[in-house]
Amino acid sequence: AGKYRKRDLNRLFVDSEQEIVEAVSLFAVITRKRIPSREISFRTQIPGSYDMKYDKIKVSDDAYVYGLLDCIGELQAVISRSKRQNDLDFANKVFGIMGELFNEVETLTEFSNTLKKIKPKMDVAAGTLNNARKLLG
């Protein structure tokens, strides 16, 4: 019974973890830092204190992959904004990162039987990548 309870708990956390991956990855790109692995470090306030401490969360494979795919969608908005601000250099760098992310996710999911909704999300990400390419001309 313990194994099934853990699987149900994982299903509950996947959406939250996915949002964390998307946000942390987007922030990393915008601040020109490295996109984190499944183990994400962050700072948090110690309860009952003003002091901060570093902590980590390790997200599931599913959450990581879906979060990266969602990040690709957000990066198109970054490209659009950068282009409007005439920062074509950054827009092109972000486009390169989008392509790398897509290729990485494609490699991670090529032989996966567990990622149920991956095909539609991959199609959306491919379309987003294509739209960003057109945007950059």
Show which residues each predicted segment covers:
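Long, charged all-alpha helical bundle/coiled-coil segments in cytosolic proteins
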Residues: 1-51
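Non-transmembrane, amphipathic alpha-helical segments
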Residues: 4-15, 56-64, 83-90, 110-117
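Amphipathic alpha-helical interaction surfaces
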Residues: 26-33, 78-81, 104, 108, ...
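Generic detector of ordered, mature protein regions
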Residues: 34-43, 72, 77-78, 82, ...
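Surface-exposed interaction/gating patches
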Residues: 53-101, 105
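Long amphipathic all-alpha helical oligomerization modules
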Residues: 84-137
